[in-house]
């Protein structure tokens, strides 16, 4: 009897919580999308991309435009080469 009662209570709890959790996940997804597309985050992404380009240019000794034309395997070899 206790097992059946526990099973029924768990099923009712799942049926009640599923819409609530769906609402939380929808809110979280909407908030994350708004944050990701905000002006501040766009500026930070731009700064991070520029920093990465400058790092690559410094590491391989080339300009960022030249570094973008190097094949991926060669690029990885250059990054891992330590004289």
From Swiss-Prot:
Keywords: Antibiotic, Antimicrobial, Fungicide, Ion transport, Membrane, Secreted, Signal, Target cell membrane, Target membrane, Transmembrane, Transport. Transmembrane segments: none annotated. Residues 66-83 form a propeptide. It comes from the Eukaryota. Residues 1-22 form the signal peptide. It is found in: Secreted; Target cell membrane. Its main location: secreted. It holds the Pfam family Antimicrobial_7. GO terms for biological process: defense response to bacterium; defense response to fungus; hemolysis in another organism; monoatomic ion transport. InterPro entries: Antimicrobial_7. Expressed by the venom gland. The keyword Ribonucleoprotein does not apply. GO terms for cellular component: extracellular region; membrane; other organism cell membrane. Amphipathic peptide with potent activities against both Gram-positive and Gram-negative bacteria. Is the most active against the two Gram-positive Bacillus megaterium and Micrococcus luteus (MIC=4.0 uM for both). It has relatively low hemolytic activity against human erythrocytes. Belongs to the non-disulfide-bridged peptide (NDBP) superfamily. Long chain multifunctional peptide (group 2) family. This is Heterin-1.
